[in-house]
Amino acid sequence: MSERLIQLAANLKKVLGKRIQSVEIALGEVTVVVYADTYFESAMLMRDDPSLAFEQLIDLCGVDYQDFRDGAWAGQRFGVVSHLLSLEHNWRLRVRVFAPDDSYPLVASVSPVWNSANWFEREAFDLYGILFDGHDDLRRILTDYGFIGHPFRKDFPISGNVEMRYDPELKRVIYQPVTIEAREITPRIVREEQYGGPV
């Protein structure tokens, strides 16, 4: 295990203290899980404390842990995972926070801490339905305005609920219930003497 990773984990424990739920070093990476009620405060400390200096948020995404590891997941269903970079110390860090209520997933927004989180949080809201408290423009970013549901949730129907198509008679786009027709696909058989052989 790298001394640098051990030092990073020690610095995290020292700076964040009881805000940390767990710290893990695995596969050459440090992952810290913070409590939802201390998420924003922890983000400020990780950015501003000179022993950490994570001045850049590289990525933020939502995760639906329903049926994770074949249903063996016992924790909260929705999580937010961020990847941070410290240019000063050349450290990378994965930060994970879980929404305490599965029926109303809500965590603090870190877009006031790192501006780059703005669109990432909108994407997590759009695709997973995770709400970010304090986000100043939380609206859909990838799906259509009239879209119902959140398509990356594991309980979202694979076929969707409605389909959109252009109606040439009305000369506009319309929505209609999904129509799926069962069809049988017959594989094509290739019969060539030289198929797969030397050229």
Curated annotation (Swiss-Prot):
Entry GO CC: plasma membrane
Keywords: Cell inner membrane, Cell membrane, Membrane, NAD, Quinone, Translocase, Transport, Ubiquinone
Catalytic activity: a quinone + NADH + 5 H(+)(in) = a quinol + NAD(+) + 4 H(+)(out)
Superkingdom of origin organism: Bacteria
UniProt-listed Enzyme Commission number(s): 7.1.1.-
A Pfam family annotated for this UniProt entry: Complex1_30kDa
Any one GO molecular function term: NADH:ubiquinone reductase (non-electrogenic) activity
Membrane topology: Peripheral membrane protein
Location(s), subcellular: Cell inner membrane
Stated role: NDH-1 shuttles electrons from NADH, via FMN and iron-sulfur (Fe-S) centers, to quinones in the respiratory chain. The immediate electron acceptor for the enzyme in this species is believed to be ubiquinone. Couples the redox reaction to proton translocation (for every two electrons transferred, four hydrogen ions are translocated across the cytoplasmic membrane), and thus conserves the redox energy in a proton gradient.
Quaternary structure note: NDH-1 is composed of 14 different subunits. Subunits NuoB, C, D, E, F, and G constitute the peripheral sector of the complex.
Family under the similarity heading: Belongs to the complex I 30 kDa subunit family.
PANTHER family in alphabetical order: NADH DEHYDROGENASE [UBIQUINONE] IRON-SULFUR PROTEIN 3, MITOCHONDRIAL (PTHR10884:SF14), NADH DEHYDROGENASE UBIQUINONE IRON-SULFUR PROTEIN 3 (PTHR10884)
Protein name: NADH-quinone oxidoreductase subunit C
Record lineage: Bacteria, Pseudomonadati, Pseudomonadota, Betaproteobacteria, Burkholderiales
